[in-house]
Amino acid sequence: MEVIKAEFIKSAVKPKDYPLETLPEVAFVGRSNVGKSSLINVLANRKSLVRTSSTPGRTQLINFFDINGVLTLVDLPGYGYAKAPPDVRKQWGPMIETYLARRGNLRAVVLILDIRRIPSDGDLQMLGWLETYDIPPIFVLTKCDKLSKVERAKQTALIASAIKRDRNELLHFSALSRDGRDAVWKEVLRLTLAQEEERI
């Protein structure tokens, strides 16, 4: 997708502060340091649309971004950062689950996984929420440039087994080389704008 406009809309914590449900949304989520900000920036063709926090796990806001005036990308807070304050860790679950349960224009969630790691309890909890609320997941494996082709294949199989999915459902991505950008966009558009056209 050619991104002409990518703009920050607003940050929110509670539903009353969310933007109006005027555009289809796709949300991005993953553990802290998984490469979520880098993925969104590459998709948007911007170097710093989403700023990477120097203190992972501290910012607990849902950030909304307008893409070309036709789609909203939503940056959900990262999870699993051990040094995050207890009150921050405690509020993460209810805030994210509330967003997933109540957001009527949410079309899909990009669940981002580090290809070098087996999915965490937080990853599995997130997948469980997506299944509960019937939200289509898009699985993206980041940091693929850090492994050899053989290692990537091995890790992809292990992760697919852990989340009980076909390995072909897992998309490979590298922020360094931008490999995988088009494949991620293709899946995002299939579940968002293509759905909107079917509704018309």
Curated annotation (Swiss-Prot):
InterPro entries: G_ENGB_dom, GTP-bd, GTP-bd_ribosome_bio_YsxC, P-loop_NTPase, Small_GTP-bd. Keywords: Cell cycle, Cell division, GTP-binding, Magnesium, Metal-binding, Nucleotide-binding, Septation. Its cofactor is Mg(2+). One of its GO terms (molecular function) is GTP binding. Mg(2+) binds at residues 37, 59. Gene3D superfamilies: P-loop containing nucleotide triphosphate hydrolases (3.40.50.300). Residues 22-194 form the EngB-type G domain. GO terms for biological process: division septum assembly. GO terms for cellular component: cytosol. Pfam families: MMR_HSR1. GTP binds at residues 30-37, 57-61, 75-78, 142-145, 173-175. Belongs to the TRAFAC class TrmE-Era-EngA-EngB-Septin-like GTPase superfamily. EngB GTPase family. NCBIfam families: GTPase_YsxC (TIGR03598), small_GTP (TIGR00231). Necessary for normal cell division and for the maintenance of normal septation. This is Probable GTP-binding protein EngB. The gene is engB.
